[in-house]
Swiss-Prot record:
Keywords: Cytoplasm, Methylation, Protein biosynthesis. It holds the Pfam family RF-1. SUPFAM superfamilies: Release factor. It comes from Xanthomonas oryzae pv. oryzae (strain KACC10331 / KXO85). The modification N5-methylglutamine is found at residue 235. Gene3D superfamilies: 3.30.160.20, 3.30.70.1660, 6.10.140.1950. Methylated by PrmC. Methylation increases the termination efficiency of RF1. The keyword ATP-binding does not apply. Belongs to the prokaryotic/mitochondrial release factor family. Peptide chain release factor 1 directs the termination of translation in response to the peptide chain termination codons UAG and UAA. This is Peptide chain release factor 1. PANTHER family: LD18447P.
């Protein structure tokens, strides 16, 4: 571990001691909001404290074993204990470094998943449907809930566009690196000559805005349209203009919702998505600026970036943001088995963040 990272760990340990003193202050105890905020911060620092205590014990074990090595009768046992202590210290070094990576406060929250067909006509819509099902099945494995907010089916299957809300603890932390252009290479069912076609779909992962996050939306900047829904709700949806489309004129962002029976409920859902999109745009600009400065790929927030190719003839998936990230497990991945892929992306992002921390004073 670099001296810079070690100093940051020491600062966190000092902050933990400071928080413990603050939380015993009667003024803080009697202030519910402040007590809750400081308690949350302290709980986030506990894993660092535990790892530092484990590291101190491992260093003491190593010193004791090295001292024991001078005794010829104990040398063999000492060598074993030295090896075990060194292995434990290496493990703790990695663990402590990972604990330094700043936690995205949005990680535990829900998200909006948007999948749109790109170039490739009917095959692009079918691929967009495949991607949506892949994420829906992954969500099901995690015990998350998927609620379709709006969709536009393709003429021969799949979706021209589908928007869903994914509800579950940690959903955003697992799927936030999926935004971008996804490309597929395969022989379409309608292709009589057996030729491989290439088509694409875009994915956007937008964290649901927390109620604490403030963003001012001027009602005068909104254009609100109503239309007859084609979604859930039985015959009622086709008789009344309950569906809502909201355009934020300054940014050009358009959201719509047609899944609820009442216009009021659809408007509430649409406004939540609009708020989430506008906040995400701000976060994405900051992430893109940082990525440009450090030449990062994972987590750059660029949705126009081609991030992945799905080659069905070869049964492989290649993620273009991480050198050497090719998995020959396409059949399982497209069925929602994303754990190995997501783990590699999270590891790469963590490495980028640690490099940034090492460079900072």
């Amino acid at each position: 571990m670099t001296p810079t990272l070690r100093r940051k760990l020491e600062a966190l340990a000092e902050r933990r001691e400071e928080l413990q003193h603050l939380l015993s202050d009667p003024d803080v105890v009697n202030n519910n909001d402040k007590f809750r905020t400081l308690s949350r911060e302290l709980s986030q620092l506990e894993p660092v404290a535990v790892a530092l205590e484990d590291e101190a014990r491992a260093k003491a074990d190593l010193s004791a074993a090295e001292a024991m090595r001078t005794d010829p009768e104990m040398r063999e046992l000492a060598e074993e204990e030295i090896a075990a202590a060194q292995a434990r210290l290496e493990e703790l070094d990695t663990q402590l470094a990972s604990l330094l990576v700043p936690r995205d406060p949005r990680d535990d929250g829900n998200l909006f998943l948007e999948v749109r067909a790109g170039t490739g006509g009917d095959e692009a819509a079918i691929f967009a449907g495949d991607l949506f099902r892949m994420y829906a099945r992954y969500a099901e494995r995690q015990g998350w809930k998927v609620e379709i907010e709006s969709d536009s089916p393709g003429e021969h299957g799949g979706y021209k566009e589908v928007v869903a809300r994914v509800v579950g603890r940690g959903a955003y932390s697992r799927l936030k690196f999926e935004s971008g252009t996804h490309r597929v290479q395969r022989v379409p069912a309608t292709e009589s000559q057996g030729r491989i076609h290439t088509s694409a779909a875009t994915v956007a992962i937008i964290p649901e805005a927390d109620d604490v996050e403030e963003i001012v939306i001027n009602p005068a900047d909104l254009k609100v349209d109503t239309f007859r829904s084609s979604g859930a709700g039985g015959q009622h949806v086709n008789k009344t203009e309950s569906a809502i489309r909201i355009t934020h004129v300054p940014s050009g962002v358009v959201v719509e919702c047609q899944t609820e029976r009442s216009q009021h409920a659809n408007r509430d859902k649409a406004m939540k998505r609009l708020k989430a999109q506008l906040l995400d745009t701000e976060h994405s600009k900051a992430a893109a600026a940082q990525a440009q400065t450090r030449k990062l790929q994972v987590g750059s927030g660029d949705r126009s970036q081609r991030i992945r190719t799905y080659s069905f003839p070869q049964g492989r998936i290649t993620d273009h943001r991480v050198e050497g990230l090719t998995l020959y497990d396409l059949p399982n991945i497209i069925e929602g088995d994303l754990d190995a892929l997501i783990a590699r992306l999270l590891h790469e992002h963590q490495a980028d963040e640690l490099a940034r921390l090492s460079d900072s004073p």
